[in-house]
A protein has these predicted regions:
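Short, intrinsically disordered terminal tails adjacent to the first/last structured region
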Residues: 1-4, 352
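Charged, low-complexity surface segments at secondary-structure and domain boundaries
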Residues: 1, 61-65, 157-164
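Residue-level detector of secondary-structure boundary/capping sites
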Residues: 17, 51, 69-70, 253, ...
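Membrane-embedded alpha-helical bundles of multi-pass integral membrane proteins
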Residues: 77, 83-352
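Short acidic (Asp/Glu) and glycine-rich catalytic loops that position anionic groups and cofactors
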Residues: 53-60, 269, 319-320
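Iron-sulfur cluster-binding cysteine motifs and their immediate structural context
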Residues: 17-38, 44-45, 55-83
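Immediate flanking context of iron-sulfur cluster ligation sites
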Residues: 3-17, 40-54
Length: 352
């Protein structure tokens, strides 16, 4: 781990703790005021509590060219991404994925070619189950989904021990889930929004983009979960009609996820890279792009139906999903898990 990033973030936090002008912006500043010195665990917790709304930067009187050169969003972003890498297993892979987006693109291309070659032996298929049986898909994707979750669980365990987390009560989890659900820490403190893409102007655009993306993803996950229950518990195997619950959840979720990620990409084009982790900027783009491709190819697959283009779109979609699953512990996908853990720990320290 880079000692320079830790030292720089600590220097800035200590100045901010003396100033306290920004303590109404987000959860970072009230948490910061509870102590005078900041160890590695404290910096890890504060960094993951930060949502990079950037409001504190635009309100600060000590940014460059002042000699203090405060840029807290960037300093915490570096510590935050390094904490994901340091606490993951293996660490080198996490760092590689965060800084080399081409690795993710290469895996997606390889997976797509694999699924395309697999489907070549089928002639005249009408549904994607004619190309890949249910059991085949389960055999491929169940390990690709479960094993990364095990890695994430291990990373969160290490995080929890590092920040001194205690036994979680329902009140702690409820507080964290509420803050995550409404993205309270992207509200700017006074519900005026944050300043991510418009310089020093307030906006709720980033909050809206994140909510579209988050809830779209959750609806897609609910679609898959519902289909699983219908298949195994109710003996109702796929394919399902357009008006069935899995289809409705999947289509609505896919549209929300596609629109949300497109919106976030638009905002990211106008954002200032210097207020985030510059070395991981490319990795952020790849992650958002992969989410968009996963959602949009799923929608296209549904719309194409039994057309000749269906096998190709099926291979691309499965390649995207496979890559998204495998890269969960190492891409920015993991930030949601760490942020929820940080919010839970914050609720504990505040007696929530």
């Amino acid at each position: 781990m880079s000692v320079d990033h830790q030292a720089e973030a600590r220097r800035q936090i200590e100045i901010c703790n003396a100033c306290r002008y920004c303590e109404g912006f987000c959860a970072v500043f009230p948490a910061m005021t509870q102590q005078r010195t900041f160890a590695l665990a404290d910096m890890t917790q504060l960094a993951n509590l930060c949502h990079n709304c950037q409001g504190c930067y635009h309100a600060c009187q000590y940014t460059a060219p002042h000699e203090f050169a405060i840029n807290l969003p960037a300093a915490l972003a570096e510590v935050r991404t390094e904490s994901w890498e340091r606490l993951s297993t293996p660490t080198w892979l996490a760092k590689r994925v965060q800084t080399h987006g081409g690795l993710v693109a290469g895996l997606m291309l390889f997976a797509t070619i694999f699924f395309l070659m697999w489907s070549q032996g089928v002639v005249g298929g009408n549904t994607f189950y004619d190309y890949f049986s249910h059991n085949t898909l389960v055999a491929i994707f169940a390990p690709a989904f479960v094993l990364p979750l095990v890695v994430i669980a291990w990373s969160l365990r290490r995080y929890w021990r590092e920040v001194g987390g205690q036994a979680v009560r329902w009140a702690h989890l409820k507080s964290a889930l509420k803050a995550a659900a409404n993205l309270k820490n992207l509200s700017g403190g006074q519900q005026q929004g944050c300043q991510y893409e418009d310089g020093d102007r307030y906006s709720h655009k980033r909050r809206a983009g994140h909510q579209l993306t988050m809830y779209g993803f959750l609806l897609c996950f609910a679609s898959t979960s519902t289909a699983t229950v219908m298949h195994y518990a109710l003996d109702m195997p796929a394919p399902y009609a357009w008006y069935s619950l899995p289809k409705i959840l999947g289509v609505v979720g896919g549209v929300m996820l596609s629109v949300g990620t497109l919106f976030l990409m638009k905002l990211k084009r106008t954002a200032d890279p210097k207020l985030g982790s510059v070395s991981r900027w490319g990795g952020d783009w790849v992650f958002i792009g992969l989410l968009f491709l996963t959602a949009s190819t799923g929608l296209l697959l549904w719309m194409l139906g039994a057309t000749p283009a269906m096998p190709l779109m099926l291979a691309v979609h499965l390649g995207c999903v496979f890559t998204l699953f495998l890269m969960m512990p190492y891409s920015k996908m993991v930030h949601g898990f760490f942020r929820l853990a940080a919010l839970t720990r914050d609720a504990q320290t505040n007696g929530g």
